[in-house]
Amino acid sequence: MSTAVDEFATPRPIAGWRIVLTAFCMAVFAWGLGFYALSVYAQYLAQAGHFSPALLSAATTWFFLVGAGALYAVDAAVARIGRRAAVFAGVLLLAGGAAALPQLRSPVALFAIYGLMAFGWAATAGTAITQIVGAWFVARRGLALNLALTGASFAGFVVVPSMVAAIARFGLGTGIAMVAALLAAGLGALLALNLREPQAMVAAGEAGAAPAAPAGPLRTDARLVAMAALFGIGWLAQVAFLAQQLPLLVPKVGAAAATAAVAATTAASLLGRLVLASIVDRLDHRRVTAASFALQAVGMGLMLAGDGPLPVIVGSALFGASVGNLITLPALFAQREFAPQHYAAVITRVWSVGQVLYAFGPLAAGLLLTASGSATLPLLVCLACQLLAAALALWRPGGKAL
């Protein structure tokens, strides 16, 4: 294991920061076309009469479930054809699938294309970015990952508005295809120029560079089970709230205040990433994770207790401050609590479990909202999940709490 002075896993630091830039653009691409744009696809495909809203919601859940299983296929592809080729294939699948969606009329074709897009998402999103950046950085891995994954937040500001504007100007099919093609071309150029394995790190046997060790020996590891549980439960609540934020808050404070709360969540997510990025490598990863989930619970508590717009907006900002950081922190668990050769396998396992759970988050929140008729029950359940995740973060398998 490298010491704190070994900032990089390679003697060429500038190459490491080029990887961070490339990973940032991967995050913009993946979250832009494979996460935030899902709501755009659902809205405009339903509006055009191509598919029903219920069918599109089911296809979205299918997308995330297939994506969870696809993570293992992507790991196998990386071992066989290399990381760059696997990412290029993912770019083609995700961008090509998005461009094809407006041409579809058959439900079978819709689910088939969403399934192919899920493989593209798996090859370009969180697990891939974490493994790529982790192969180049050691002591400052938290900083590098936070900067790279800031692209996920940036995608929410840039890709969706650009896609909506393109659809309004050029029509549904041309608008989506244009945005997808531009994103794919830009990312493809960066991948061709920058993405490669750090050979010096492979020779040294550092964390993240070696091929992923088989996940089999980890299956009964209590640390991995607890880690997957805490992030899976926390992400489930997080995605449930974010997907239903407007339906939950509009009846409580009105459309204008609810929209302001969504904007506060997004802005706080970006700010929270930048603040934590500069200090996360010096902090205890378990305490940071527990504090992040607890902060989200406090934000939900404010939304529950407050009657006017201010508590809802402030609560949404507190919730949002941890949104981005909670997809970075699993990498620090993997680096600090597991052997270097297991880094990639641990990341894949945690993301696959988490994605299976959070795939059902929007549906669960919607059902609770419909059944109860108010935002109180969904918010209480999400708050309880975040507190449970915080408690799990403070517990080390073997009975030792922090």
Regions found by a protein language model. Name each.
Residues 92-105, 295-307:
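C-terminal ends and interior cores of transmembrane alpha-helices
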Residues 152-198:
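Helix-loop-helix hairpin linking two adjacent transmembrane segments in secondary transporters
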Residues 70-82, 273-284, 369:
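Helix-to-loop junctions at the C-terminal end of transmembrane segments
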Residues 123-137, 325-338:
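Intracellular juxtamembrane helix-capping segments at the cytosolic ends
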